[in-house]
Amino acid sequence: MTILLLISCKNSENTETEKKSESENEITQSEFKKVESQNGLNLEYQLLDENNEQIKFSSLTKMPEFPGGLDSLTKFIQRNYKFHQGFTEYINGKVKSTFVVDTFGKVVDIEIVERLRKDYDTACYKVISKIPDWKPAEIENNKKVKVKFLLPFKFVTDE
């Protein structure tokens, strides 16, 4: 059995079952904007002020930067994702997570907003908690702001 972790899926269509299974903590897609990426990473973001209120996207002058860029972020997640290989059941599904890159570039406020199963949820949480510091985002006048990211993990199991 092989478990494939896809953090770069681009499927934005929700099936009727997926729509029904969205948790009450789910953040609506309209509140997030897609990160433009050449590697297909399905990462979305929103800007937050010091009170965690959303800021207009148009005020952004500099996106937060992961060391080495988004390709390096994808590789980091794939290298650091740890999953127990002893499971014999097949599972396909998605874990959606959010995290904030604060004004110091630290990854904070990690949440699993759409759950799959406890072991998968925990593994996703752990890999996000290991993400190193970023260069923080900036708006006008070089003011640093927080950025909240939405990162889905898609799992596909084959025999």
What role is predicted for each listed range?
Residues K10-E159:
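Charge-biased low-complexity segments
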Residues L5-S8:
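C-terminal motif of bacterial Sec signal peptides marking the signal peptidase cleavage site
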